[in-house]
């Protein structure tokens, strides 16, 4: 039965907006059940039916083609010269130019094009397109939420996956290259047939490495040379220091002799400030700091054991900090025991090369960096915390300490573009961005980079891009938001004032603790004076007198009287 409703509207009302209103209910149809049809109904018995109790799901797959980037170039040196003209000879080219300039077609074409080109030049000169309407404009990023964006990911091309143990950016900030050292540092956990290669990657071509370093032992740390960027220094697992030249094949150019090298893996090294740029220093868990020169690798320039003053026990070094702003001979070493050694290479007395030792961490220190805007303050990362220290012999405690994280910290560093920002990476695969300019008690941003442990970290010179290595060999390149990479005008002064305030607070606390200890000693002295002071001689005299009184052989006492009565 078809149900329809007729709506009539005049032609003149077409195009007007309708105005609807509420009306009462109206019955349009009333269909009663048919009893004859009901009598013909027969129930089916048995009934076969199928029921699906789980949610319906379908499988979808997508296979995207990887974008493979290849750099190609063509050198066209001949130019547009004819074959009979030698472009290397100036006389031939001048003679040919004069010949062409006398051609009638050339003259007519230049005259025709000259008028149109002249109009375009006048239009370009009419308006100064390079005029700056607003100068010294400061960007306000306070309203922008901090965030990061993944630029690319470098994956270890080998089947046996190794950890990205060290990451270092190219010293030239305009060159987007990263050297990544791959290794398995766990003792006796290296599988058979494990590759030893480490790679230099180009951010613009993440599919294939730009250069492969093939060492004699797996590389634990690698850094670009600061003066000659074609050289890459590498600290190896067997304790040797080698350097590679990207222009001279994949093997090391030269390496230190095994008998005078470290006895443990080289966990960190630094290029020193020198005229040639070939001097460097290495640190290892064997307890020694060694200095080398690439021009003479067959011998060690200098050796320094890591031990405190008036102590014969050496401690193993894990990380190294060298900053020319703090002095070309000053450096710091983070140890396995959680101590920070502040050293001076050129001390007059060899015993005084270790200036002082700071303690505070409960485990190895994996990160140690000075603030790039004020080298007096430095950051240490170890156990479950990150701590900010001041290089002052009067302050032996950190001026700032982060909260204890539920997982272990594995690295981090300061931001090179903002004085109050530093980064930490953790074993749970998260990266924390701390902004001391806004808050101290918790990180400004936490990014879950991977489900696996983060093992290496480095920041580009511009401060806007970071590289994070994981335990499965992946290296993620992340781009920070402008609020995390660009400093505000008064940030440096405010951060320095905050550090000075915290330093003064620590000094006042230490002064109060010393005064409390002196007061406690005085109270203890007063209590000792109240007690009965008996000397050792007086105690000896009282003891002898007691034994004489109670001894029977002397003739006195209870035993002597009893014997006389028996007689």
Swiss-Prot record:
GO CC, one annotated term: cytoplasm
Q: What is its main location?
A: cytoplasm
Signal peptide (UniProt feature, chain positions): none
Compartment(s) of residence: Cytoplasm, Cytoskeleton, Flagellum axoneme
Q: Which InterPro entries match?
A: Dynein_IC, WD40/YVTN_repeat-like_dom_sf, WD40_repeat_dom_sf, WD40_rpt
What does the UniProt keyword field contain?
Cell projection, Cilium, Cytoplasm, Cytoskeleton, Dynein, Flagellum, Microtubule, Motor protein, Repeat, WD repeat
PROSITE patterns, per this entry?
A: WD_REPEATS_REGION
Tell me the ranges holding the WD repeats.
Answer: 214-254, 261-302, 360-399, 404-444
GO biological process entries = cilium movement involved in cell motility; outer dynein arm assembly
Transmembrane portions of the chain: none
Outline the subunit composition: Consists of at least 3 heavy chains (alpha, beta and gamma), 2 intermediate chains and 8 light chains.
Q: State the similarity comment.
A: Belongs to the dynein intermediate chain family.
What is the recorded function of this protein according to its Swiss-Prot or TrEMBL entry?
Answer: May play a role in regulating dynein heavy chain (DHC) activity. May function in holding IC78 to the DHC, or in stabilizing the entire dynein complex.
What is the recorded name of this protein? Dynein, 70 kDa intermediate chain, flagellar outer arm
Q: Which organism is it from?
A: Chlamydomonas reinhardtii (Chlamydomonas smithii)
User: What gene codes for this chain?
Assistant: ODA6
């Amino acid at each position: 039965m078809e149900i329809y409703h007729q709506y009539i509207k005049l032609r003149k009302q077409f195009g007007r907006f309708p105005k609807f209103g509420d009306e009462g209910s109206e019955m349009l149809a009333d269909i009663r059940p048919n009893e004859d049809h009901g009598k013909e109904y027969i129930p089916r018995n048995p009934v076969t039916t199928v029921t699906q109790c789980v949610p319906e799901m379908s499988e979808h797959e997508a296979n995207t083609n990887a974008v493979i980037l290849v750099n190609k170039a063509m050198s066209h040196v001949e130019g547009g010269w004819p074959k009979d003209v030698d472009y290397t000879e100036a006389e031939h080219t001048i003679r040919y130019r004069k010949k062409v300039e006398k051609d009638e077609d050339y003259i007519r074409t230049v005259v025709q094009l000259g008028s149109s080109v002249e109009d375009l030049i006048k239009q370009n000169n009419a308006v100064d397109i390079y005029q700056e309407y607003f100068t010294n404009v400061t960007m306000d990023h306070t309203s922008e939420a901090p965030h990061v964006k993944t630029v690319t990911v470098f994956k270890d091309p080998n089947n046996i996956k190794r950890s990205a143990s060290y990451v270092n950016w190219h010293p030239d900030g305009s060159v987007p290259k990263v050297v990544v050292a791959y290794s398995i540092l766990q003792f006796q956990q290296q599988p058979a047939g494990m590759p030893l290669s480490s790679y230099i990657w180009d951010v613009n071509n993440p599919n294939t490495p730009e250069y492969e370093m093939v060492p004699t032992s797996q590389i634990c740390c690698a850094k670009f040379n600061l003066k000659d960027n074609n050289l890459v220094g590498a600290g190896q697992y067997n304790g040797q220091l080698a350097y590679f030249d990207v222009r001279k094949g994949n093997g090391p150019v030269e390496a230190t002799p095994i008998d005078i090298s470290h006895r443990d893996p080289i966990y960190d090294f630094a290029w020193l400030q020198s005229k040639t740029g070939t001097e460097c220093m290495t640190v290892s868990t064997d307890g020694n700091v060694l200095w080398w020169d690439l021009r003479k690798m067959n011998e060690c320039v200098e050796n320094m054991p890591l031990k405190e003053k008036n102590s014969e026990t050496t401690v193993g070094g894990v990380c190294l900090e060298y900053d020319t702003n703090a002095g070309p001979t000053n450096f710091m070493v983070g140890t396995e025991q959680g101590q920070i050694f502040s050293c001076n290479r050129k001390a007059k007395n060899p015993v005084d090369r270790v200036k002082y030792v700071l303690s505070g961490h409960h485990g190895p220190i994996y990160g140690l960096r000075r603030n790039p805007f004020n080298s007096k303050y430095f950051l240490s990362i170890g156990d479950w915390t990150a701590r900010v220290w001041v290089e002052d012999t009067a302050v032996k405690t950190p001026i700032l300490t982060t909260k204890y994280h539920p997982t272990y910290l594995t690295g981090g560093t300061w931001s090179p573009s903002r004085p109050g920002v530093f980064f930490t990476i953790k074993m749970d695969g998260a990266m924390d961005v701390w902004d001391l300019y806004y808050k101290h008690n918790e990180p400004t941003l936490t990014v879950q980079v991977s489900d696996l442990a983060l093992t290496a970290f480095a920041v580009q010179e511009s401060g806007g891009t970071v590289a994070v290595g994981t335990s499965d060999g992946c290296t993620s390149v992340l781009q920070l938001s402008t609020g995390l990479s660009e400093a505000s005008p008064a940030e440096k002064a405010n951060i320095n004032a905050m550090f000075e305030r915290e330093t003064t607070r620590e000094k006042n606390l230490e002064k109060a603790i010393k005064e409390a200890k002196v007061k406690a000693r005085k109270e203890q002295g007063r209590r000792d004076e109240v007690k009965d002071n008996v000397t050792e001689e007086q105690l000896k005299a009282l003891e002898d007198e007691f034994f004489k009184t109670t001894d029977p052989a002397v003739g006195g006492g209870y035993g002597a009287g009893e014997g006389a009565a028996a007689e």
